[in-house]
UniProtKB/Swiss-Prot annotation:
One of its GO terms (molecular function) is four-way junction DNA binding. Residues 141 are annotated as: Flexible linker. Its main location: cytoplasm. It comes from Helicobacter pylori (strain Shi470). Has three domains with a flexible linker between the domains II and III and assumes an 'L' shape. Domain III is highly mobile and contacts RuvB. Keywords: Cytoplasm, DNA damage, DNA recombination, DNA repair, DNA-binding. GO terms for biological process: DNA recombination; DNA repair. Pfam families: HHH_5 (PF14520), RuvA_C (PF07499), RuvA_N (PF01330). Residues 1-63 are annotated as: Domain I. This is Holliday junction branch migration complex subunit RuvA. The RuvA-RuvB-RuvC complex processes Holliday junction (HJ) DNA during genetic recombination and DNA repair, while the RuvA-RuvB complex plays an important role in the rescue of blocked DNA replication forks via replication fork reversal (RFR). RuvA specifically binds to HJ cruciform DNA, conferring on it an open structure. The RuvB hexamer acts as an ATP-dependent pump, pulling dsDNA into and through the RuvAB complex. HJ branch migration allows RuvC to scan DNA until it finds its consensus sequence, where it cleaves and resolves the cruciform DNA. The keyword DNA repair applies. InterPro entries: DNA_helicase_Holl-junc_RuvA_I, Hlx-hairpin-Hlx_DNA-bd_motif, NA-bd_OB-fold, RuvA, RuvA_2-like, RuvA_C, RuvA_C_sf. One of its GO terms (cellular component) is Holliday junction resolvase complex.
Length: 183
C-alpha cells in the first residue's frame, strides 16, 4: 500500500498532479487547494490515500494530515465519493469546513459542485460530533474513527465521548468507550 510520495512534480492540472519518484511517474488526484501549492519542477511530499476499486486504482494526495483525515471521513458517507470529497476540500480548508459543520451552514455546503440539499443535510448529520471544540479534540477524533470503523453509530459514539476523561490516552479512551458501548 502506498501511504506517501516524495518526488518531483512533473505536471499539475486543477485536480491531478504527476509526481516522478525514482523514474516512476504517479498520477495523484489532489484538491485545487493542493494543486495551487504545488509547483512543476519542485520537490513535493504528499500523504497518500490509495483506493482500489474493481475498475481503477486511485491515489489521492494531501499536503496536510488534516486534509487526509477529513477526506477519509467524507468517503464513509453514503453518496460521497472521491470526486465530491475533493470538491469539498477544493472549496474549504479543514478548519473552514469544521466551522461550516459546527454552525450548520447547509447553504454554504450546497455551493460545492455536486452537493444538493439532500446530500448537504446527510453530510451535516453524519459529521455532527466528528469535530469537537476543545483540547481533547485529536484524541476524540481518533476514538471516534476507531469506534465508527467497528460499526458503532455516530449518535452512540458522541454520547460516550462526552463521558470520557480528558487525560486518557487514545488507547485507554477506546477501551473505556468500548466498555461503555458494550454494557
Amino acid at each position: 500500500m502506498i501511504v506517501g510520495l516524495i518526488g518531483v512534480v512533473e505536471k499539475i492540472s486543477a485536480l491531478e498532479a504527476h509526481i516522478e519518484v525514482q523514474g516512476v511517474v504517479y498520477g495523484v488526484q489532489v484538491s485545487m487547494r493542493t494543486s495551487a501549492l504545488l509547483q512543476a519542477g519542485q520537490k513535493a511530499r504528499l500523504k497518500i490515500l490509495q483506493v482500489i476499486k474493481e475498475d481503477a486504482h486511485l491515489l489521492y494526495g494531501f499536503l496536510e494530515e488534516s486534509e487526509k483525515i477529513l477526506f477519509e471521513r467524507l468517503l464513509k458517507i453514503n453518496g460521497v465519493g472521491g470526486r465530491i470529497a475533493l470538491a469539498i476540500l477544493s472549496s474549504f480548508s479543514p478548519n473552514e469546513f469544521e466551522s461550516i459543520i459546527a454552525t450548520k451552514e447547509v447553504k454554504r455546503l450546497q455551493q460545492v459542485p455536486g452537493i444538493g440539499k439532500k446530500l448537504a443535510d446527510k453530510i451535516m448529520v453524519d459529521l455532527i460530533g466528528f469535530f469537537i471544540q476543545d483540547e481533547t479534540k485529536p484524541m476524540h477524533n481518533e476514538v471516534f474513527l476507531a469506534l465508527e470503523s467497528l460499526g458503532f453509530k455516530s449518535a452512540e459514539i458522541n454520547k460516550v465521548l462526552k463521558t470520557l476523561k480528558p487525560h486518557l490516552s487514545t488507547e485507554a479512551a477506546i477501551k473505556e468507550a468500548l466498555q461503555q458501548l458494550r454494557s
